[in-house]
Regions:
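An alpha-beta-alpha
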Residues: 116-171
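Extracellular/periplasmic periplasmic-binding protein-like sensory domains
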Residues: 211-289
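Beta-alpha junction/loop-to-helix N-cap segments that form part of ligand/metal-binding clefts
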Residues: 23-24, 38-106
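Extracytoplasmic "Venus flytrap"
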Residues: 8-27, 50-52, 280-284
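Solvent-exposed, acidic/polar segments of extracytosolic/periplasmic ligand-binding ectodomains
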Residues: 5, 322-386
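Short beta-strand elements in bilobed, periplasmic/extracellular small-molecule ligand-binding domains
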Residues: 38-54, 110-112, 161-177
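Periplasmic-binding protein-like
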Residues: 67-79, 99-101, 140-141, 191-207, ...
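Short, charged, surface-exposed loops that flank catalytic or proteolytic processing sites
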Residues: 300-312
């Protein structure tokens, strides 16, 4: 008789971050579906999905249903830090594991969470490392008015200060706010070297559209001179911004669809076969896919979905994934991840301009790399592509 292992999926496919949620949803479902074809007959992998519709209170009730009513011992889910923090106490209460795939602001390490998304030394630091020597040390910070925006900009402010940089301005907007005229006017007045964009969803789209228009009116603000740089912008949002609108701006991620590896070509073919030839996988889709495969493989190889056993297994056995060799540190439950900086092309893809080999996560920036990685002139073994 086969052992039934239920894995919960908890993503919003509606609301201000719907495009991210859809990519995560699809990545989880495809990852489990592909894993089931290779699972041992003794393991019956079952997926139980819930959509909180971007309602914070529903995250809690849906997570409760997955854990208590359906008997899931693993949940792949949540996008925002607010949602993650909302359900962690419930996950702890049920002795379960939450698998979190999104970039976040760091300063967290919980034994009930496996973090396969990047923390600041895997996204913000590599981005500043690339941008500051090329464009300058004067930054304008704009962010979503919640913990992701606050904390990421706080870290950026600290890192800029340590590198003799300057914050020329700092603004925060709700995720669904699209009136960015005052922010654009302030940027035009202060003329920063680059803009660090930590907005989410419609506010980010509106800002990039308005900045594109500013660049058309005033050549000083063309992205080739003063780019907008992001730590959470991927392929899944470029269509909503508008064709070619974000061209020349930069983002950092552990995966871009343009990666030229044989593994990525095979992955893209599989995605095209399942989701259509026009679907360009983002880091959200790829990371959720890799995470779902990791969960399924760990359950299959150990023969149990016991979270204690699975956590011990995944923190002691590296896995080959579409992101590369994924190793999870037993001290922090965070994955080592590559960092790629991509420049948005006219075709709404990312041209990779810098790649960093897998970086060990340092969620509390406790090691020298956390404060020294962005200082020009240090040997950091970066591979500059262009």
């Amino acid at each position: 008789m086969s052992h039934v292992a239920k894995v919960g999926v908890l993503y919003s496919t509606e609301g201000p971050y719907a495009s991210i949620g859809r990519d995560c949803w699809d990545g989880a479902h495809l990852g489990i579906a592909h894993a089931r074809t290779q699972a041992a007959p003794s393991v019956d992998l079952q997926l139980v999905s819930a959509d909180p519709r971007a309602d914070l209170s529903r995250y809690l009730s849906e997570a409760q249903a997955l854990l208590r009513d359906h008997g899931c011992r693993h949940i792949i889910g949540t996008i925002t830090s607010a949602a993650r923090k909302e359900i962690i106490p419930l996950v702890e209460k049920h002795d379960a594991l939450l698998w979190y795939v999104c970039p976040y602001e760091g300063f967290e390490a919980n034994e009930s969470v496996i973090y396969t998304g990047p923390c600041p030394n895997q996204h913000l630091l590599p981005m500043l490392d690339y941008v500051m020597p090329r464009f300058g040390h004067r930054a304008y910070l704009i962010g979503a008015n919640y913990v992701w925006g606050w904390e990421t900009n706080r870290l950026a402010r600290q890192l800029l200060h340590e590198s003799n940089g300057e914050v020329t301005g700092e603004r925060y907007l709700p995720m669904d706010e699209t009136d960015v005229d005052r922010v654009i006017a302030d940027i035009r007045t202060k003329v920063p070297d680059f803009i660090l964009n930590n907005l989410v969803g419609p506010s980010s789209h509106a800002f990039l559209q308005a900045y594109h228009e500013l660049g058309r009116q005033d050549p000083r603000f063309h992205p080739s001179s003063r780019p907008v740089v992001s730590c959470n912008l991927t392929e899944c949002e470029l269509g909503a911004i508008g064709s070619g609108i974000a061209e020349g701006n930069l983002s950092v991620a552990s995966y871009f669809a343009s990666l030229g590896t044989p593994e990525n070509r095979s992955f893209r073919s599989a995605i095209a076969a399942e989701l259509g030839p026009d679907r360009s996988p983002s880091a959200f889709l790829a990371t959720t896919y890799a995470t779902a495969r990791l969960v399924a493989e760990a359950i299959t190889l150990t023969g149990t979905d016991d979270p204690v056993v699975i956590r011990s297994f995944v923190t002691s056995h590296p896995f080959e994934t579409i992101l590369g060799r994924l190793a999870i540190d037993h001290r922090t439950n965070h994955a080592s991840l590559p960092a790629h900086v991509g420049r948005i092309s006219l075709k709404d893809t990312f041209d990779i301009v810098m790649s960093h080999p897998p970086v060990v996560a340092d969620p509390y920036l406790a090691h020298p790399q956390g404060q020294g990685a962005i200082r020009p002139g240090q040997d950091r073994h970066l591979r500059i592509v262009s």
